[in-house]
Regions:
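Short, polar loop/linker segments at the starts of domains and inter-domain junctions
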Residues: 20-35, 129-138, 176-181
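Active-site signature of cysteine proteases
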Residues: 112-152
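Extracytoplasmic/periplasmic, Sec-exported soluble proteins
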Residues: 1-2, 37-45, 80-83, 99, ...
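N-terminal capping segments
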Residues: 1-58, 150
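Low-complexity, Pro/Thr/Ser/Gly/Ala-rich linker/spacer regions in secreted
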Residues: 1, 149-160
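Short, solvent-exposed alpha-helical surface patches in non-cytosolic proteins
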Residues: 46-51, 156-198
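Short helix-capping/linker segments at secondary-structure and domain boundaries
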Residues: 56-60, 197-198
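...with weaker cross-activation on analogous glycine-rich loops/strands in unrelated enzymes
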Residues: 2-4, 58-125
């Protein structure tokens, strides 16, 4: 799955709220814990991230409800980054700069010194524990690091490049390639075949 596909899953959740407000009772916690839970012991910003990646079929470095534990696991697997954030990264925030991890989100866009992320358990008047999924824009200086997942790459290839690869690797002649290209989706098929052979 690509970053864009994952972000579509996350953005479809914007507006989901815990019920009742302030309870941490939300579908992501029910999925994660295997039962309905509520109370202050169940903040769910990281649980939301875990849920999104589960739906996308992308493995996380560790199953956890802790932002710090995810960042540490990402570091141990060589998948942590500090700076140069990009869409699809899971950023970890330290809002008060005390060295502890406070919150997380899935980066949707980066613009100069600002990051826009889709976050669980946030709200418009606070940084964390706000009770809903929202798109938030924050200063990059609040980020202590991020997990950079391994996404499937979307490769662009011209039809001519695809033809050459198929001819070289599959041993097909120019006539057969022309025949394939004549079908309704022939050029698209050739590009996909060539990408698989590459």
């Amino acid at each position: 799955m690509t970053e864009k596909e994952l972000l579509r899953i996350a953005s479809a959740e914007i507006g989901t709220k815990e019920n009742p407000a302030g309870s941490n009772k939300v579908k992501y916690n029910t999925w994660y814990y295997g039962r309905a839970v509520s109370g202050k012991a169940y903040p769910w910003c990281m649980v939301f991230v875990q849920w999104v990646f589960d739906r996308a079929g992308i493995a996380v470095p560790i199953k956890t409800a802790s932002c710090g534990a995810l960042l540490n696991a990402a570091k141990s697997k060589g998948q942590a980054v500090k700076g140069g954030y990009r869409p699809g990264d899971v950023v970890i925030y330290d809002f008060d700069g005390n060295g502890s991890t406070d919150h997380c989100g899935i980066v949707e866009a980066v613009n100069d010194k600002l990051i826009t992320a889709i976050e669980g358990n946030t709200g418009s008047t606070n940084n964390a524990d706000g009770g809903q999924v929202q798109r938030r824009t924050r200063n990059v200086s609040a980020v202590v690091g991020a997990w950079r997942p391994v996404y499937r790459e979307v490769q662009t290839m011209t039809t001519d490049e695809a033809k050459k690869i198929i001819m070289d690797k599959a041993g097909l002649d120019a006539y057969t390639i022309q025949f394939l290209g004549a079908y309704k989706y022939g050029e698209e098929l050739m590009v996909k075949l060539a990408q698989a052979m590459k």
